[in-house]
């Protein structure tokens, strides 16, 4: 399979912030009797990700539309924790095409060395954990801890509110010496504390630039001599996303590894079961599908505001540890319709729209009648199940990784899904008939386990193309041409043919 086109857009935002004097939850701030100076805090999401985040051919940036509710600052020093939570009434928020700034007035503090933490849109769970800290060491532990990404209602890392992204944002704390006797007027120059933060979540989306014919997309197989032959059509394309982390680190690790980075399934048994993938990854959005967005030109930054998306959490591993069963994927579901030449004799006339389709692996033909398919496609050697793949209700499936690292799918080794990025997967061409179901949903031998993800799209066990979760990412057969775009919130461009 040839890699044709893939776009990745790394997402970033810029915030400028200076705090005002306001008490928040937790220990009381320094009183005016002990405060001897003023300071301000400047918060920013960088215009470019750090090295490693901004790889894979950047081609642009997207400023984003963020909903800022509050900003919480923790100033640690002299054995005290000064907590200040500032609502929108205390903030001047300016959102531009590429940056967002948040500005507050300087506030009074005691001079000396301080460690400053800042969180935008803090969630109740995170706030409770940080405010429970009574000393610098406990606060550091709480700030570096992992929290539920989406399962705690009201404490999700990202929600869509009035077409705006409401996301928790955080970054590395800054250690800085606060100078004494600095007035409020001079605080932004002499006692300004710069903090870089990132959005904790990722945005995933899907588009298609292949043009439909009579409402459906032609699947064009390549024959000898690079001749394209239409073998079927696919319509009613909808997508979902899964296998992203259930937890996230409030403070991103220096190596950007996520909480379950060490989970590397070595077998299907490792993938399944209560201690397998279901323990670490979220599959809850598989049934909540979005229609694939049609484009008439290559995906670009200008399309970002108009394309529907889903939020996912950071999901990464060491470079050599990516497997099909631990990597975030987008799943596409469509309705398959073979062309006349792909039907066995008499079967097309007998087929009723929406019924099951049966593909014979011996004849290479489709059947409307299962018994006819089984008879014409016996098991190898006459023993076992007939060599027939069932496409239930004519449904067909394709999957794609969010952020593969090379231009050739046969050499993929990793697909890191990093926070503060927008990943768009664009389908530019279908080459092959897809899978009979979704192969990447873990199961549990215990039927009473309530945590077992629901997989309404179980693949046919006879489908020879169904991959195993312990396999590395490279694939030898592919099904569609995909453009993956990651948008700073930095745009990256890849060509991939599936």
Swiss-Prot record:
Positions of S-diacylglycerol cysteine lipidation: 20
Cysteine-cysteine disulfides: none
Compartmental location: Fimbrium; Cell outer membrane
Pfam families linked: Fimbrillin_C
Signal peptide boundaries: 1-19
Region: Disordered, residue numbers: 436-476
Main subcellular location: other
Annotated GO CC locations: cell outer membrane; outer membrane; pilus shaft
Top-level division of the source organism's lineage: Bacteria
Site (Cleavage): 50-51
GO BP annotations, alphabetical order: cell-cell adhesion
Propeptide residue interval(s): 20-50
Lipidation (N-palmitoyl cysteine): 20
Keyword annotations: Cell outer membrane, Fimbrium, Lipoprotein, Membrane, Palmitate, Signal, Virulence
NCBIfam families: fim_Mfa1_fam
Subunit architecture: Structural component of the fimbrial stalk. Minor fimbriae are composed of a structural subunit, such as the 53 kDa fimbrillin, and the accessory subunits Mfa3, Mfa4 and Mfa5. Fimbrium assembly occurs by linear, head-to-tail oligomerization of fimbrial subunits. This is mediated via insertion of a C-terminal beta-strand from one subunit into a groove in the N-terminal domain of the following subunit.
Family statement drawn from the similarity comment of this UniProt entry: Belongs to the bacteroidetes fimbrillin superfamily. FimA/Mfa1 family.
Function in brief: Structural subunit of the minor fimbriae. These filamentous pili are attached to the cell surface; they mediate biofilm formation, adhesion onto host cells and onto other bacteria that are part of the oral microbiome. They play an important role in invasion of periodontal tissues and are recognized as major virulence factors. Mfa1 orthologs from different strains have highly divergent sequences, and this correlates with pathogenicity.
Protein name according to UniProt: Minor fimbrium subunit Mfa1
